[in-house]
């Protein structure tokens, strides 16, 4: 709705989407207000909308950017041809019929252009996020990051001739920029850190930055050379009284001859003459980078502080190493990325300080699936497993999740499509089909409000483990979803997490 606000309050508004159009604005499930943007003159509103319903909505990610004009009350879709015909011709400068996610419109200061993020493939939420530029006067589109093999996010204008954005690059998040007239991306910042948000502050940049060893603080960034100067030190009194473990960057050779970046976090006061219990961390997503993130849930330094070496590989399927590396996992859940996990833990296990007789494996979401799958093929590597909201049964998962487009893309299709070799390979390698090989204690977390990977997946896994006679424990949060957010529940989660590891691994 768009309505006037005056001294008497909010006047009756105008439904700019239409009462008969049951469309998401902004998009579910996060309803991010960054998907809605007024122009600077206050005369037009750009917003993200997914103009689909029913089954079409469930199997596609096709959203578009719409622009509503306050003066004439008209709306137009800048991502699709106005006449509904496929008239896209790149050589002629026509607009593409953009079938994937189109999100996050940002107006230029002069209101002549709209920058936004676009994905080419409908149904693939992990397709490359491209930075597009729409000219409001000529209706021409420009893909600014066509030759840049990383995602773009958090787009900010600097004047009307320069765009800054964040990109994941080799397991870090950096500020980049591009002048549309030049067309070449420049990486502004460097280093092992995650810049998660920023804004222009005159001729400087104010940024939020974290590392594996530091929660988010504010930094000043010099756009000329990318130099970062810390502004805030909110947590210094805390850091002054605790010890952090060393974070090592390790390149591991995979079974197919690639190099894989793996973070190794050592316990505080690490002594190379001693042997330490070691954890393999399996990342979720599955297309979600193992970067320099600081988490209140999966905190590597907290694990290290308990005396564990943490091995966190950027296995196949994770962003920041190019789209080919990321795409490989789709249709191959049980394949190369699983071998990548084992390559990482086997490489670290060769170190004299890693105790190969005291190893555990932990992960959430896709990482939870990885735990279930590895439980059936780890060949006695691990003494204990912990799975948080993991996928256990691919067939039942297909009928339970609220993101059907995701399952179709990552599994290859529905389980009943017998002619689809990719899909049939996926379902043939569902973890529940290898339970007869499970022989290792399993702790399982889940949330009753989880609609991404419903808690019934965890119930199935727990039942299977208990019937098999394997030590198993189920921790179910009745008021949590896919993650644990409530502080009291987080305390319970960590107590259970480390209690299990200390009992069976340490």
Name each model-derived stretch:
Residues 45, 111-115, 162-164, 205-206:
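Hydrophobic beta-strand positions that form the internal "hydrophobic ladder"
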Residues 299, 304-305, 312-506:
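Active-site-proximal cap/loop segments of hydrolase catalytic domains
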Residues 266, 274-284:
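Short beta-strand element of the alpha/beta-hydrolase
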Residues 1-16, 22-25, 34-37, 44-49, ...:
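Non-catalytic accessory segments flanking enzyme active sites
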Residues 286-288, 310:
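Serine-hydrolase catalytic-loop signature spanning alpha/beta hydrolases and amidase-signature enzymes
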Residues 1, 19-32, 48-66, 77-103, ...:
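A flexible loop/linker signature enriched in serine peptidases of the S9 family
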Residues 40-41, 109-110, 158-160, 200-202:
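Residue-level detector of Asp-centered blade-edge/turn motifs that repeat once per structural unit
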Residues 5-8, 69-73, 135-139, 179-183, ...:
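Short loop/turn segments that connect beta-strands within beta-propeller blades
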């Amino acid at each position: 709705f768009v309505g006037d606000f005056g001294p008497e309050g909010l006047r009756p508004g105008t439904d700019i989407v239409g009462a008969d159009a049951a469309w998401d604005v902004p998009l579910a499930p996060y309803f991010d207000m960054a998907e809605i943007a007024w122009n600077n003159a206050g005369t037009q509103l750009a917003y993200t909308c997914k103009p689909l319903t029913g089954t079409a909505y469930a199997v596609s990610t096709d959203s578009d950017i719409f622009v509503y004009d306050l003066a004439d009350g008209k709306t137009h879709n800048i991502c699709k041809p106005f006449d509904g015909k496929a008239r896209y011709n790149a050589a002629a400068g026509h607009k593409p019929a953009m079938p994937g996610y189109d999100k996050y419109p940002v107006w230029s200061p002069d209101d002549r252009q709209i920058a936004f993020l676009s994905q080419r493939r409908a149904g693939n939420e992990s397709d490359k996020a491209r930075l597009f530029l729409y000219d409001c006067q000529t209706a021409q589109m420009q893909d600014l990051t066509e030759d840049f093999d990383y995602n773009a996010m958090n787009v900010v204008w600097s004047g009307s001739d320069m765009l800054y954005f964040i990109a994941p690059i080799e397991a870090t998040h950096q500020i980049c920029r591009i002048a549309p007239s030049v067309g070449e991306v420049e990486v502004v910042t460097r280093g092992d850190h995650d810049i998660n948000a920023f804004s222009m502050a005159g001729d400087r940049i104010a940024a939020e930055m974290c590392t594996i060893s530091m929660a988010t603080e504010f930094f000043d960034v010099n756009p000329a050379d990318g130099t970062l100067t810390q502004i805030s030190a909110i947590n210094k009194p805390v850091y002054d009284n605790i010890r952090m473990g060393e974070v090592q960057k390790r390149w591991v050779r995979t079974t197919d001859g690639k190099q894989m970046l793996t973070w190794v976090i050592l316990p505080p006061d690490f002594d190379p003459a001693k042997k330490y219990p070691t954890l393999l961390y399996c990342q979720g997503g599955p297309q979600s980078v193992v970067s320099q993130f600081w988490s209140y849930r999966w905190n590597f330094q907290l694990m290290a502080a308990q005396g564990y070496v943490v091995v966190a590989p950027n296995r196949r399927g994770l962003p920041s190493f190019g789209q080919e590396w990321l795409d490989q996992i789709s249709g191959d859940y049980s394949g190369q990325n699983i071998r990548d996990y084992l390559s990482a833990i086997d490489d670290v296990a060769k170190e004299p300080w890693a105790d190969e007789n005291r190893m555990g494996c932990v992960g959430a979401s896709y990482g939870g699936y990885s735990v279930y799958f590895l439980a059936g093929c780890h060949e006695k590597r691990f003494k204990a497993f912990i799975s948080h909201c993991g996928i256990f049964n691919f067939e039942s998962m297909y009928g339970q999740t609220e993101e059907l487009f995701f399952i179709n893309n990552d599994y290859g299709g529905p389980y009943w499509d017998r002619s689809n070799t990719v899909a049939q390979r996926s379902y043939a390698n569902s973890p529940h089909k290898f339970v007869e090989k499970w022989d290792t204690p399993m702790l399982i977390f889940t949330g009753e409000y989880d609609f991404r990977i419903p808690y019934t997946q965890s119930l199935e896994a727990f039942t299977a483990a208990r019937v098999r006679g394997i030590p198993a424990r189920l921790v179910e949060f009745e008021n949590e979803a896919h993650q644990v957010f409530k502080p009291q529940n987080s305390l319970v989660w960590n107590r259970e997490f480390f209690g299990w590891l200390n009992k069976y691994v340490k």
